Amino acid sequence: MKVTCVLVLTLMALTVCQVATAYCINVGMCIYDGYCCSNRCWGGMCSPWR
């Protein structure tokens, strides 16, 4: 997981990075426990593998 939430927050202008659950956004990135990762999305959750 990479701490790129600041970048996402700037682009999305939302507080989605503060959500405790994992959600997929249109950019193809995942948000999990406040952290954004470039892993693939599976069922709206962040996949542990790329």
Swiss-Prot record:
The keyword Signal is assigned to this record: yes
Signal peptide boundaries: 1-22
Keywords: Disulfide bond, Knottin, Neurotoxin, Secreted, Signal, Toxin
Source superkingdom: Eukaryota
GO molecular function: toxin activity
Free-text domain note: The cysteine framework is VI/VII (C-C-CC-C-C).
Protein's name according to its UniProt entry: Conotoxin Cal6.19
Species, as recorded: Californiconus californicus
